[in-house]
């Protein structure tokens, strides 16, 4: 290393002289300080001069590195290992001068080294970090302002119940809310000492969980406790909607050191105070082919309770728990303290005592006793309030009576009012001009008729929109004929128009399909005049979940809260309900929907088979080859033919050749095909016409393919058989079928496959050989003339030209 210093100094001085720069002393001083480590691998300075005079004389670092890979000159790579030293002393620059580029650079390496570092940093930031080795620092300033919204956060949604962007743009979504889904699909028994007016104005308003005394769930199967896997005893439900046994959930909560624990199903927080009593009732699950009974429902606009038309009453407050007839149609059921005590608390106490008697000697008994203790505390609280609150209840009832009677007295003072502009409820933007109320007598009956008439076209309109929204039907011209249902002498006005629709009799959210609604409207004039109950066979059931778009299209279902699950059921209405003329009028829509169901079923079966085949291929199982043998034309069956000349020869000739007759079981399966496809020779047919099955010629009863072609025209005389009746479309390709063997029932013409065309061409050629010629070639032999050699016939050609 000390010997290389003079040569390196000489090289640096030569470079300074050639450059002619005034800053040569500074550059040479700095180059002397770092020349020894560079000169060891650079070699003599004279060798580097010619290389830098060419196209790389501009000082390009990329070309220098490619042509001299052993020379560590590239700043992007050489500077990385020395960056730690350069950071210690900013004034001391260890960067070597560029070879051969001193004359072309207007600035020296020492005075502008900082700018080069910036350029190198900018170039390095443009590439991925994987392209550089060693310690590196990546500029991440472009990530400083990067933010994202966490999943499930409803930051951009307003308090109106739907996203502000989601209504205008389809990509907007509303985050899933477990409590909203639970409250939309369940019925709640709440305490009666609270105000629930907000729940009658907005169906999406959540019930305060502290006011809930019991939750009622209607499901198609009885739920089971996910901890003990048995039907829950004294069941409790969490805010996330999962049901447990009371003793099981207490045992689970005791395992946590905190006052709460995560739900074992959805990992939501479960608090002991949030556990509510729950009762699950099993309902029938209807399927296609079942008979269902639907009843006519009536609901006023602006009211969120729909009741049967036969039991309809004006509902302005929640239904009481004791009303058994109407309790299944309300989301909220008011319960007094006595009702909660007798119908909720005491029933749970009895179930827990029975469970304790059965599992008294099990480790679970301590948690059962803890549940019984909590029931007793709740019982004492309710019984104390119920016993001491009798006087307060009487005072409140008297006050309510006074408040309810006050509007009746004040309303009579403003009775003689003239026509004013009245608006409907908040769910409808229409306004109607009310006529004078002076003659109330003759106008009373028309008002009722007008209310029915106004509500019915709206129900029909909802049915049309619902049909369009489902994408399964179109509105026909029949609906336009039903529009003038209203009487011409009346004005279309109504203070509270009603919706009419059909719902399942047991209270499930199953509604009648718009196609059936149009049939009933055509038959009876309006839904209000339709039967109160109809029974028919289920044809199709489509499930939906209530959303903002669905609510706008199905306005008669606006009383259902968001995320509420419901079904649209199509029935096969029969003449007892609707006439044959009505069914014929809507036969096109019914048939169209039937074809759509069949197509959907075929697509589902194809998808299932495709998935099954893919799964079998993964496991190494491939489908078996299936060769259908039902085509008797391509695979003829063995039949014993009777010769027409047997009757003329008599019984002796039949007995003489009886040894040559073959039975169907005397041949092997392989000889059946050869026997059927091999005709008789003309000699055998002439000499012994009684041979109906076969003949011997040249020690062989069979002919070669060339002999068969040579005597093909004479085959008809020697082979008596009944010509099969062929249809005109025998050579027509079969109906197009799919890969799974199911016809699509469409008029499309498929592309013919090579296999079908080849077999059909061969069959057509053989059929031409089977047809007898117009002139008999044997007559020429009898005349003494030599029979000419027949021209060979071409059976099949692939139209491929072979050149020599």
Swiss-Prot record:
Catalytic activity field: S-ubiquitinyl-[E2 ubiquitin-conjugating enzyme]-L-cysteine + [acceptor protein]-L-lysine = [E2 ubiquitin-conjugating enzyme]-L-cysteine + N(6)-ubiquitinyl-[acceptor protein]-L-lysine
Pfam family, one: zf-C3HC4
Composition-biased stretches (Polar residues): 646-655, 795-804
GO CC, alphabetical: cytoplasm; nucleus
Keyword Transferase: yes
GO molecular-function terms, A-Z: transcription cis-regulatory region binding; ubiquitin protein ligase activity; zinc ion binding
Alphabetized InterPro entries for the sequence: MAG2/RNF10 (IPR039739), Znf_C3HC4_RING-type (IPR018957), Znf_RING (IPR001841), Znf_RING/FYVE/PHD (IPR013083), Znf_RING_CS (IPR017907)
This protein's pathway: Protein modification; protein ubiquitination
Cysteines engaged in disulfide bonds, as pairs: none
Described function: E3 ubiquitin-protein ligase that catalyzes monoubiquitination of 40S ribosomal proteins RPS2/us5 and RPS3/us3 in response to ribosome stalling. Part of a ribosome quality control that takes place when ribosomes have stalled during translation initiation (iRQC): RNF10 acts by mediating monoubiquitination of RPS2/us5 and RPS3/us3, promoting their degradation by the proteasome. Also promotes ubiquitination of 40S ribosomal proteins in response to ribosome stalling during translation elongation. The action of RNF10 in iRQC is counteracted by USP10.
Summary of subunit composition and partner proteins: Interacts with MEOX2.
Family listed: Belongs to the RNF10 family.
Protein name according to UniProt: E3 ubiquitin-protein ligase RNF10
Source species: Mus musculus (Mouse)
């Amino acid at each position: 290393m000390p010997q290389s210093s003079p040569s390196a100094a000489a090289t640096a001085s030569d470079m300074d002289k050639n450059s002619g720069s005034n800053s040569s002393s500074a550059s040479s001083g700095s180059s002397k300080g770092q020349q020894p480590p560079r000169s060891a691998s650079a070699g003599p300075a004279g060798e580097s001069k010619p290389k830098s005079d060419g196209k790389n004389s501009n000082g390009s670092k990329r070309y220098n590195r490619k042509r001299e890979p052993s020379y560590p000159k590239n700043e992007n790579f050489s500077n990385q290992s020395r960056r730690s030293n350069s950071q210690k002393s900013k004034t001391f620059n260890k960067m070597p001068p560029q070879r051969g580029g001193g004359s072309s650079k207007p600035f020296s390496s020492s005075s502008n080294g900082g700018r080069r570092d910036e350029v190198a940093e900018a170039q390095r930031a443009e590439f991925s970090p994987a392209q550089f080795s060693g310690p590196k620092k990546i500029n991440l300033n472009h990530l400083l302002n990067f933010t994202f919204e966490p999943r499930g956060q409803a930051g951009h949604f307003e308090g109106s119940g739907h996203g502000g962007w989601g209504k205008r743009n389809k990509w907007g979504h509303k985050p899933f809310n477990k409590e909203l889904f639970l409250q939309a699909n369940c019925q709640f028994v709440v305490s009666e000492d609270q105000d629930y007016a907000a729940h009658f104005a907005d169906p999406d308003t959540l019930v305060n969980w502290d006011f809930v005394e019991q939750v009622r769930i209607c499901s198609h199967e009885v739920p089971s406790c996910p901890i003990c896997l048995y039907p829950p005893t004294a069941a409790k439900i969490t805010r996330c909607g999962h049901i447990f046994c009371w003793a099981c959930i207490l045992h689970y909560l005791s395992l946590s050191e905190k006052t709460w624990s995560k739900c074992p199903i959805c990992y939501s927080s479960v608090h002991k105070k949030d556990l509510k009593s729950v009762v699950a009732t099993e309902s029938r699950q209807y399927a296609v082919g079942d008979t269902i009974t639907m009843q006519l429902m009536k609901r006023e606009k602006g009211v969120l309770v729909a009741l049967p038309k036969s039991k309809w009453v004006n509902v302005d407050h929640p239904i009481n728990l004791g009303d058994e007839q109407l309790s299944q149609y309300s989301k909220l059921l008011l319960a007094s303290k006595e009702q909660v005590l007798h119908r909720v608390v005491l029933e749970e106490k009895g179930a827990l005592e029975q469970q304790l008697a059965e599992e008294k000697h099990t480790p679970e008994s301590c948690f059962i006793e803890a549940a019984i203790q909590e029931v007793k505390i709740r019982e004492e609280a309710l019984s104390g309030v119920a016993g001491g609150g009798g006087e307060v209840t009487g005072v409140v009832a008297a006050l309510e009576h006074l408040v309810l009677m006050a509007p009746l007295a004040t309303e009579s003072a403003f009775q003689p009012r003239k026509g004013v502009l009245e608006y409907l409820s908040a769910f409808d933007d229409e306004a109607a001009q009310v006529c004078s109320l002076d003659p109330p007598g003759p106008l009373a009956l028309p008002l009722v008729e007008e209310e029915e008439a106004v509500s019915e076209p709206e129900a029909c309109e909802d049915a049309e929109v619902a049909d369009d929204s489902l994408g399964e039907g179109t509105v026909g011209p029949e609906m336009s004929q039903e529009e003038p249902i209203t009487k011409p002498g009346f004005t279309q006005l109504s203070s509270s128009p009603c919706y009419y629709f059909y719902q399942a009799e047991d209270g499930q959210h199953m509604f009648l399909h718009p196609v059936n609604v149009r049939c009933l409207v055509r038959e009876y004039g309006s839904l209000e005049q339709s039967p109160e109950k109809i029974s028919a066979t289920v044809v199709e059931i489509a499930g939906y979940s209530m959303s903002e778009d669905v609510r706008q299209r199905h306005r008669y279902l606006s009383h259902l809260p968001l995320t509420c699950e419901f079904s649209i059921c199509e029935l096969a209405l029969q003449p007892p309900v609707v006439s044959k003329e009505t069914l014929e009028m809507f036969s096109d829509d019914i048939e169209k929907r039937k074809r759509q169901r069949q197509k959907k079923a075929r697509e589902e079966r194809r998808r299932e088979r495709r998935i099954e085949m893919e799964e079998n291929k993964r496991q190494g199982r491939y489908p078996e080859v299936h060769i259908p043998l039902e085509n008797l034309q391509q695979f003829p069956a063995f039949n014993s033919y009777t010769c027409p000349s047997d009757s003329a020869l008599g019984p002796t000739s039949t007995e003489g050749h009886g040894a040559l007759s073959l039975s169907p079981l005397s041949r092997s399966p392989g000889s059946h095909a050869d026997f059927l496809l091999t005709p008789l020779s003309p000699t055998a047919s002439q000499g012994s016409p009684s041979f109906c099955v076969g003949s011997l010629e040249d020690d062989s009863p069979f002919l070669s393919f060339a002999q068969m072609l040579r005597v093909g025209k004479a085959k008809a005389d020697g082979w008596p058989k009944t010509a099969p009746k062929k249809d005109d479309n025998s050579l027509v390709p079969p109906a197009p079928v799919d890969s799974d063997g199911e016809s699509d029932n469409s008029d499309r013409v498929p592309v013919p496959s090579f296999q079908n065309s080849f077999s059909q061409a061969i069959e057509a050629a053989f059929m031409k050989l089977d047809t007898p010629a117009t002139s008999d070639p044997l007559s020429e032999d009898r005349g003494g003339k030599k029979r000419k050699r027949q021209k060979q016939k071409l059976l099949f050609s692939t139209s491929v030209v072979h050149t020599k």
